[in-house]
A protein has these predicted regions:
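Short amphipathic
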Residues: 1-10
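C-terminal structural segments of small proteins and small subunits
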Residues: 52-89
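Amphipathic alpha-helical interaction surfaces in cytosolic regulatory modules
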Residues: 12-32, 41-57, 75
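Conserved beta-strand core positions
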Residues: 4, 33, 59-61
Length: 89
């Protein structure tokens, strides 16, 4: 099992498009991939679950990967998460 702490860009969160993109990427891996914001936990392969996560107050989230391709999966998801920008109105 691999656990990574990731700091998102200021104001960024899992709104519709980034959540969908991340879920599509996550489904390419066998590993179980979970993202937590505080006490809330979501399956990274489920866009709706990601969208339900609260906006991280300090931008900090935790990514947990467990499975045969956990290192590759965690690296790919971290890269994708770091590109998420805040939703412009």
């Amino acid at each position: 099992m691999l656990i990574k702490s990731i700091t998102m860009r200021p104001g960024a969160h899992f709104h519709a498009r980034p959540a969908a993109d991340l879920a599509v990427l996550a489904r390419q891996f066998e590993s179980v991939l979970l993202i937590s914001v505080g006490e809330e936990l979501a399956d990274a392969k489920n866009a709706l679950a990601l969208m339900r996560l609260p906006k991280p107050k300090d931008g900090s989230i935790e990514l947990t990967a467990s499975g045969p391709d956990e290192e590759e999966a965690a690296a790919a998801l971290e890269t994708q998460i770091l590109t998420i920008e805040r939703l412009r109105k």
